[in-house]
Amino acid sequence: MGKVVGIDLGTTNSCVAVMEGGKPTVIANAEGFRTTPSVVAYTKNQDQLVGQIAKRQAVMNPENTFYSAKRFVGRRVDEVNEESKDVSYGIEKAGSNVKLKCPVLDKQFSPEEVSAQVLRKLSEDAGKYLGENITQAVITVPAYFNDSQRQATKDAGKIAGLEVLRIINEPTAAALAYGLDKKSNERILVFDLGGGTFDVSVLEVGDGVFEVLSTSGDTHLGGDDFDRCIVNHLASVFKSNEGIDLREDKQALQRLTEAAEKAKIELSNATQSEINLPFITATPDGPKHLDLNLTRANFEELASKLIDRCRVPVEQALKDAKLSTGEIDEIVMVGGSTRMPAVQELVKRVTGKDPNQTVNPDEVVAVGAAIQGGVLAGEVKDILLLDVTPLSLGVETLGGVMTKMITRNTTVPTKKSETYSTAVDGQTNVEIHVLQGEREMASDNKSLGTFRLDGIPSAPRGVPQIEVTFDIDANGILSVTAKDKGSGKEQSISITGASTLSDNEVDKMVKDAESNASVDKEKREKIDLKNQAETLVYQTEKQLGELGDKVDDSAKAKVEEKSKALKEATSKEDYDSMKKLLEELQQELYAIGSSVYQQPGNQPPAPGGPNANASDDKGPDDDVIDADFTETKD
């Protein structure tokens, strides 16, 4: 099999790594950076931009620039009411699914499609680095992602043209990277605060075995929320001074968001940050500017509730693992948001330990994913990974109660069967409602979907025996089967709500992505051809000027004619003519170069140096040599 890359598909930034020579290597993108912004944009020319280039133009194109798509992946419209208010692009409803509105293309994208474009760029950049086409990947997800979000991430990989060999939890990946060379047993707590999600996992690591003891988290907490605190503060101050709410202007909101992120990063190292946004808006009285000084203490006060929310999952994970803080050997910090001093102080206060900062919080998850990819490809031996399911799984039973079949923190893969029966006499079918969560009532948990089993022989209530089996694979993705013991018939059931996209939708998106990829490739090739043509025209003019009368008039006229024709073809964007003329002009230039060297006095130096072919017949000036030498006489 080919190389398997590990991809950390982040809310804010993403990263790709691969195993090389038995060691994980982070791969820089085409722009030379080791992380890539998880941003996709479409310009007025309908060109697609991904990564840094998309992020740079966001202020001027807020409605067609998509970021933080991970917050919407695998979720329903009614689950993202708050998040949808905090982005500059439009969120629309398609049934119960989330769609991202792209006005410039007059179409809608699913969040999975946007994530797929980021995955495609990462895999293509990795392919260029490795010199081969990348088709297989291990992709990370927050440990607290539910079944729908995991399946949606897998769909995004498929749309990007990747076979997703494994979905792996981000804290587990970080532990793999941290503990790869550890021989002695350690109990570690991974504190993973990223751009949009927060996870805590407790693991036992040592001698190639990575066992997850517990996991907890909050999929609604991350760096974006800390940015939003600053955005709301800036907007409130400006509104009180000027009477204008900047959050209602998409372009102003985008500028506020970028300024907030910049200030947050600065305040991790400095005690204050100057926020200056000239011409942020305008009134009949003229332009308005925002100029404000934000101190670290002020920021920590604004974000105090968010910081406090980080405490509960830590305590829950320790409780579920049945460990005290004194039994934890190391605290591993993961995610860019862990650079905030207030977060580090909270961890120290809760655990009584200084966090271990030997790993790169932006890259460690991708490194761990690459190691898991190496395991699956057979490159890495003697690694055993035992992960857990983050949330309980069960079914709705009489009275609207959730009956748990697989409890949270159960090691995966796992399989569990329970037998259920009918509720009324003569019932010939049952509807089973599959749930995920920790609440007692079915309505308070995440619905993964319902399925119906027909053909049950008519019998008094309580007599039929329907065996329902829950099967969680190594990706943490659930499948359900049902068997009627009376008739002996067994049926495999697909949970219809497990993903927000149907198989047909995914297949269509795969085809669209492949089609767009070929269009994008053609555009790049045309741009490269145009650049080559313009460069050659410039070099031709320069070369003719430098050579002057060394070029005979007929050859010069021929070159000038070709150069002029190429210039015209370039301005008309006639790519077929450009390609033909480019080759012809290069041949004419080669001919000129050869003729110049063949002229007397312009012989090129011989391979051995300036005197390699010197004869013994010396002319009057042949004794003059610009070189140091020693003459030895016998």
Swiss-Prot record:
Belongs to the heat shock protein 70 family. InterPro entries: ATPase_NBD, Chaperone_DnaK, Heat_shock_70_CS, HSP70_C_sf, HSP70_peptide-bd_sf, Hsp_70_fam. This is Chaperone protein DnaK. The modification Phosphothreonine is found at residue 197. Induction: By stress conditions e.g. heat shock. GO terms for molecular function: ATP binding; ATP-dependent protein folding chaperone; unfolded protein binding. The keyword Endoplasmic reticulum does not apply. It holds the Pfam family HSP70. The keyword Metal-binding does not apply.
